[in-house]
Amino acid sequence: MDPLGPAKPQWSWRCCLTTLLFQLLVAVCFFSYLRVSRDDPTVYPNGSHFPDSTGTPAHSIPLILLWTWPFNKPIALPRCSEMVPGTADCNITADRKVYPQADAVIVHHREVMYNPSAQLPRSPRRQGQRWIWFSMESPSNCRHLEALDGYFNLTMSYRSDSDIFTPYGWLQPWSGQPVHPPLNLSAKTELVAWAVSNWGPNSARVRYYQSLQAHLKVDVYGRSHKPLPQGTMMETLSRYKFYLAFENSLHPDYITEKLWRNALEAWAVPVVLGPSRSNYERFLPPDAFIHVDDFQSPKDLARYLQELDKDHARYLSYFRWRETLRPRFFSWALAFCKACWKLQEESRYQTRSIAAWFT
């Protein structure tokens, strides 16, 4: 017998077995890869899960990139399904590496307004990516708006005609009985306060204050005035019956935290200088505030406040609305979640002229 005879079929059997094992190994690796690709997307440093960088997202959850943190101050990012009822969650991140895949980019104007061409995203945006212009400042404090024309698809601001309306505050009906304690009038030991950071000696609000204080004592807090240590504002302002909620510029819907937080949270009656009374009444009951336009002069306003100081029943009438309504306040997290809701609610793609609209 040829000693090599039986060797040939033995070698062939081993070869077939090796080939089958190799093919089985390749198949296992392939299906394992598919499973990992499906179940374990790329994890970015903030812990959010996003698709690969092909430029065409395969995700169903909207991915929102915050191009900058507002005023460069990071916040805890929310679960939008918990903040805005009826809204599905979005992936919200400030990690610019996800820019090619982002469904939307929120640009806070303050951080880009001094040099928009250098500070806006430079890489080409992917098809369908929506840019959201975001500002809570008035047009008087927003520079270089014309440089933004042609870039943005949605607006987000305090203006009620924004695509995404983010007011500084609003009133919400109580779901049951009011849970706050009644106003402790005996704790209101002072009359009028004003906290101001940007003085602006030639501004309308400072000129009005100077005329008012000739007839009425007003305690002014802030830079170059009475100190107001951090964390003591509400405790301090709650001692006052009235608060001057004077805006730094006069524009439609520009009703800021000066009214919503400084006055209403301190349970002080707001004395407002800003847009028209009718504009305020779109957001507040007419007896929830005092408007300077209701008086022919600061002297007349001073006389009225002094009358209310002595007439407890009339003063307390400015709090009747609290029996059915409660103030709610703006937050950055809520604004981002409103953008999340809008992106899922409406897919329309448009280009806005920011400069023509925001005046």
Curated annotation (Swiss-Prot):
GO terms for cellular component: extracellular region; Golgi apparatus; Golgi cisterna membrane. Pathway: Protein modification; protein glycosylation. The keyword Transmembrane helix applies. It is a single-pass type II membrane protein. Residues 1-14 are cytoplasmic. Its EC number is 2.4.1.152. Residues 35-359 are lumenal. Disulfide bonds: none annotated. N-glycosylated. Keywords: Glycoprotein, Glycosyltransferase, Golgi apparatus, Lipid metabolism, Membrane, Secreted, Signal-anchor, Transferase, Transmembrane, Transmembrane helix. GO terms for molecular function: 4-galactosyl-N-acetylglucosaminide 3-alpha-L-fucosyltransferase activity; alpha-(1->3)-fucosyltransferase activity. InterPro entries: Glyco_tran_10_C (IPR055270), Glyco_tran_10_N (IPR031481), Glyco_trans_10 (IPR001503), GT10-like_C_sf (IPR038577). Pfam families: Glyco_tran_10_N (PF17039), Glyco_transf_10 (PF00852). Belongs to the glycosyltransferase 10 family. Homodimer and monomer. Monomer (secreted form). This is 4-galactosyl-N-acetylglucosaminide 3-alpha-L-fucosyltransferase FUT6. It comes from Pan troglodytes (Chimpanzee). The lineage of its organism: Eukaryota, Metazoa, Chordata, Craniata, Vertebrata. The gene is FUT6.
